[in-house]
């Protein structure tokens, strides 16, 4: 089986486990990008935590779910945004959030993976890769 977008597969695994009411989700294969996104979700209180499991091949993440995620996914096509665009929150980005103050956009920036709120504080832009609310 060829996995073209491991981040999309990880977000789908989390969303499906949340919809089924499960307490944990297994994400495989692992990557640094997925680890950084999970770190953000943990810091913002959407997941209870995660751990890396070395299976001798690609590795896996076990994610503890709290039942706080209503929707999660990737943004396709990956959209580059400047700081000014992010401050205005254009329509093509607003559609991924429930409302202005609810949810997060996750960006890949030159300074690392971060939320849109953190990018606004640092006054930098990046590529929008995922959303959660």
From Swiss-Prot:
What is the name of this protein?
A: Small ribosomal subunit protein uS8
| Quaternary state and interactors | Part of the 30S ribosomal subunit.
Described by its record, this protein's role is as follows:
One of the primary rRNA binding proteins, it binds directly to 16S rRNA central domain where it helps coordinate assembly of the platform of the 30S subunit.
Tell me which Gene3D superfamilies the record gives.
3.30.1370.30, 3.30.1490.10
Q: Which Pfam families match?
A: Ribosomal_S8 (PF00410)
Intrachain disulfide bonds = none
Query: Which Gene Ontology cellular-component terms appear in the entry?
Result: ribonucleoprotein complex; ribosome
